[in-house]
């Protein structure tokens, strides 16, 4: 079993301080150095819009100022990390989500307000305004995890069930969103049945996306308690974690495994991905105890 060393964590911290956003500096400090969670909340404020949502390139692939579901998913993820997903700014963001939801109850992957602004090639505004599991499942799952009640969540949950229980093919990001939802939705029996069905799809299809990205078990099993753990043998999970430990680059970061379409996203995603790698390894007891 391979583990991160304290030196590896120090190298990651040096990369974060040298290259990443102020937000990731505070996320790293809060997660691994005993930093103040309030600083993460404060660092999110510049990305918040008057409509209650988040934008302003919080999610690096969408550079426009407007509030986007993917940016709100990111904000909620970071607030969940520091135990602050009950703050009032979450309620105002949910009010915004309610206002922009599609008729099916889901959120679009890209809101049309991105039109005219630089964005990744895969940030395509759909011709039909309809929900996507990628932001909807993740956001709904995080709200369920934190027992945060809001009018938006009911229809969004129904949408997620409809998609998860009927889908016949999924890409990596849809699967990750489904896992976040299934890990946290209250109906555990239904979640288990849906996870068994989804796991068979994941294991029998060739995973990947338009950019030819592949997955590793640790992408789906972010913690030992994840409902997706049953999709893999213990040996598969442990081997993938060994690979993750060994994937740290010379500069202290972990690699971004998708195309970088404009230079700044390399640093913005680099800090994000590096923190995510250490979080996963920490949850699987692959990091030194003094890290957390």
Regions found by a protein language model. Give the residues of each.
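Preference for long, amphipathic alpha-helical scaffolds in soluble/luminal domains
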Residues: 1-292
């Amino acid at each position: 079993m391979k583990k991160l060393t304290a030196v590896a964590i120090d190298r990651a911290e040096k990369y974060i301080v040298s290259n990443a956003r102020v937000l990731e500096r505070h996320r790293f400090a809060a997660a691994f150095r005993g930093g103040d969670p309030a600083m993460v909340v404060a660092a999110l404020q510049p990305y918040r819009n008057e409509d209650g949502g988040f934008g302003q390139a919080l999610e690096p692939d969408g550079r426009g100022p407007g509030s986007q579901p993917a940016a709100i998913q990111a904000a909620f993820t970071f607030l969940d990390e520091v135990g602050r997903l009950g703050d009032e700014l979450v309620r105002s963001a949910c009010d915004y989500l309610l206002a922009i939801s599609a008729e099916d109850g889901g959120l679009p992957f890209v809101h049309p307000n991105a039109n005219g602004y630089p964005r990744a090639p895969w940030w395509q505004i759909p011709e039909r305004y309809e929900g996507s599991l990628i932001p909807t499942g993740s956001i709904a799952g995080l709200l369920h995890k934190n027992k945060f009640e809001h009018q938006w969540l009911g229809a969004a949950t129904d949408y997620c069930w409809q998609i998860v229980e009927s889908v016949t093919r999924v890409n990596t990001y849809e699967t990750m969103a489904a896992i976040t939802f299934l890990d946290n939705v209250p109906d555990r029996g239904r979640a288990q049945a849906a996870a068994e069905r989804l796991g068979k799809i994941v294991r029998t299809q060739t995973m990947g996306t338009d950019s030819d990205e592949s997955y590793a078990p640790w992408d789906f099993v972010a913690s030992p308690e994840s409902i997706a753990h049953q999709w893999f043998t213990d040996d598969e999970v442990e081997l993938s974690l060994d690979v993750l430990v060994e994937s740290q680059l010379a500069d202290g970061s972990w690699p971004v495994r998708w195309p970088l379409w404009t230079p700044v996203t390399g640093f913005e995603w680099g800090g994000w991905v590096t923190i995510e790698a250490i979080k996963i390894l920490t949850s699987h007891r692959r990091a030194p105890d003094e890290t957390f």
